Amino acid sequence: MGKGAAKYGFKSGVFPTTRSILKSPTTKQTDIINKVKSPKPKGVLGIGYAKGVKHPKGSHRLSPKVNFIDVDNLIAKTVAEPQSIKSSNGSAQKVRLQKAELRRKFLIEAFRKEEARLLHKHEYLQKRTKELEKAKELELEKLNKEKSSDLTIMTLDKMMSQPLLRNRSPEESELLKLKRNYNRSLLNFQAHKKKLNELLNLYHVANEFIVTESQLLKKIDKVFNDETEEFTDAYDVTSNFTQFGNRKLLLSGNTTLQTQINNAIMGSLSNEKFFDISLVDSYLNKDLKNISNKIDSKLNPTSNGAGNNGNNNNTTNL
């Protein structure tokens, strides 16, 4: 590590800053050309030395003339093609010619890329400067508008000429559209679900419709014989789905209690003794079977334990 490593943070192998391969501006950099050709300011803000005032030693009284480089002329002078090519009989001569051609090619590419980089840098700086100026103008305009609104009162004509409501932004319009689509879909779903429940109730009640003469005679006999059993053949939710309770209990005074139990377990809000769409969905998803198995395991733990003990005894005897 050399003596000058301290200024690089005591790090070895640090490369110096890169320098441009073009020492002067090119002829395509119009911004520098216009700046050089523009008249110099005079007066207090002028540049230079007044008459009778000597300039400091080692400096120039007049600014040196800026020389612009034409990249094509520079390439023609520095990387010109060889005028005469010697016979390349030997392999060493061929290698030297190939290396010289590669050096010329790489130097030409370096000149072109450096000129393109300078032009791109100038365009980016101009674009960035315009953006910053525009943002500053908008900020100043906003501040001035707030100040003027604080110190003045809106006139009646100005108030009537402006809209009563603010227009929605594109984000707000998109959000409102999504909300409307959601509400429309939800209403359609609820209406469809209501129709399915009504159709299912009609299916249950249709079992009690009298459509034949034999059914009519049978029903008349039941009425005149003072039978106390309710005339319904509806599908029993408790016996067919949940497997706890029986039909007589469902048709007795405990119907409301059984319905509340079913609603609490199945998440249904229906107060009828017929099963609704939610129970059908639970049955298709096998949720009812899982609940029934859990209830059986809770109600009959002794039988399971006895069965296990019997199996253990049989294994021991064997």
From Swiss-Prot:
Low complexity: bias regions: 300-318
Region (Disordered): 295-318
Taxonomic superkingdom: Eukaryota
Molecular function (Gene Ontology), one example: structural constituent of ribosome
Record flagged with keyword Ribonucleoprotein: yes
Localisation per UniProt entry: Mitochondrion
Keywords: Mitochondrion, Ribonucleoprotein, Ribosomal protein
Gene Ontology CC terms: mitochondrial inner membrane; mitochondrial small ribosomal subunit; mitochondrion
Cystine connections: none
Principal place of residence: mitochondrion
Assembly and oligomerization: Component of the mitochondrial small ribosomal subunit (mt-SSU). Mature yeast 74S mitochondrial ribosomes consist of a small (37S) and a large (54S) subunit. The 37S small subunit contains a 15S ribosomal RNA (15S mt-rRNA) and 34 different proteins. The 54S large subunit contains a 21S rRNA (21S mt-rRNA) and 46 different proteins.
Similarity-based family: Belongs to the mitochondrion-specific ribosomal protein mS26 family.
UniProt name for this protein: Small ribosomal subunit protein mS26
Organism, as annotated: Saccharomyces cerevisiae (strain ATCC 204508 / S288c)
